[in-house]
């Protein structure tokens, strides 16, 4: 007979246990991609994550006291900035992992709900992170395919538990596409790119690392993110401290050829759109099952970053200012990125999750050989 108890995480040792549970649960999985351990630590630590400027959180562990053993975890998060922006009183749940035991999953969700209710929240939603830059959604389609480092992976029994709990309903779905890199740039993109260059004086802009980091262009990219994504599901405007963190963590590591900007020649070459890609880390991280960089993990990642030792590229971020969306700026971005993908020998591109309702973004893939191969869901229940 199991004896499931839920305990709050209150120490650094407890946080290490919270993080470790994921690696234990997914050890040996062919599809899960181990997250970088230091990245998890920085995200979940109050003294390291700038999101705690406007968020509060509590982490919980499920313990089977009859063994004893950790059998589940959950993070309860209140993003006060997002709640104010969208006029909601929501507590989010994330980092939600558990063994195939309905008592475990239900008690973890109850703990998150109780914590939120004590703080005046009226809804429980998730899986979500602190902000939209964190992993979101529970995988409900494409579970038997390799994941990526940027999204959640979960076992098939996860959504079955959510269905069994009944109080939860669908709040939002995200779709993911796998795209075959074409041998030549599709005529739709090539012709449109040529047309808008001459018609609207929009041009592709490549950057040096100095221009991006020291020159401030990377911050401009994230300012476009704030403007482009502002009306998307529960999006919260990124703060300057968050932007600085993303520049340090990701942009500094990026291959400059895989970052494409579009500028308006009629407006002092103002940046109006961008696309950011990274070589896929999936294979390298799967060989490094524990999420640690040492002793050999960093060499595998470096080989991918510098030598492009993978046939897949991840299209991580793309954005165009609203007033330029109907001027074909996306065609310029894709035409340039496809050229760079050819240069490095990439055969496949993984597009990051897009809202099911975002038909404009999804319509782009009709001009390429693509398949919608994953779907993930966010759930909601009243408290």
Briefly describe each language-model feature range:
Residues 125, 178, 261, 276, ...:
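Short beta-strand segments
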Residues 2-4, 152-232:
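Acyltransferase donor/substrate-recognition loop-hinge adjacent to the catalytic core
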Residues 22-64, 74-84, 206, 212-318:
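A conserved beta-strand-loop-helix scaffold within acyl/acetyltransferase catalytic domains
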Residues 57, 172-176, 374-378:
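Short hydrophobic/aromatic beta-strand or adjacent loop that forms the aromatic wall/cage
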